[in-house]
Amino acid sequence: MEDSPLPDLRDIELKLGRKVPESLARSLRGEELAPREGAADPSGVGGSCSSSSSCSSFAPSVSSSSSSSPASGSPRRSHPSALERLETKLHILRQEMVNLRATDVRLMRQLLLINESIESIKWMIEEKATITSRGSSLSGSLCSLLESQSTSLRGSYNSLHDGSDGLDGISVGSYLDTLADDVPGHQTPSDLDQFSDSSIIEDSQALHKHPKLDSEYYCFG
């Protein structure tokens, strides 16, 4: 029996949209596959196919496995790109944090300067208030002293010239004499008058006694 002619695979390729693998074509030709080629075959089909229908049943599995291989490689490529984007975002965030820290440091320095200026102004205001209070207290004490002196002088002057302060009918001289009586060893004008009268009497008596002595002396002589 003669071998059947090789079937036309173009119709199958047009229907599948893919080229028939070489291993399948060899099996259709009736050639024996080597052990290495059978092991390397992704379809895992060994031996020869007797008809085109049996070979066509394995074609979709081969095409599906070949079509799934590019899709499995796409996540591997997208994974590094996602890592790169994440690293880029982290770098940007770190740079922004550094900028924010520098801005925070500048703001803190400005706040410290403002606080120091406020404290200095407050100290100056307090010092000025204390100086003003001291000056006002000194001026008030001086004014009170002057007023007290003026009132005391006026009161003493008025008491001397006023007769309604308990000295009715008594002169100032007699009042001073009464005050001098209270002082021990102090001679009043009345004492001086008595002293002058007694001295005059004693002098007159002495004058009257001396002529008598002289006359008696001359008599005995």
UniProtKB/Swiss-Prot annotation:
Query: What GO biological process, any one, is recorded here?
Result: positive regulation of canonical NF-kappaB signal transduction
* Extent of Basic and acidic residues compositional bias: 28-39
Q: Name the residue ranges with Low complexity bias.
A: 48-75
Location of N-acetylmethionine modifications: M1
**Domain of life of the source:** Eukaryota
InterPro entries referenced in this protein's UniProt entry, alphabetically:
LURA1/LRA25, LURAP1
Q: Which UniProt keywords apply?
A: Acetylation
> Region labeled Disordered — which residues?
24-81
Q: What is this protein called?
A: Leucine rich adaptor protein 1-like
**What taxonomic ancestry is recorded?**
Eukaryota, Metazoa, Chordata, Craniata, Vertebrata
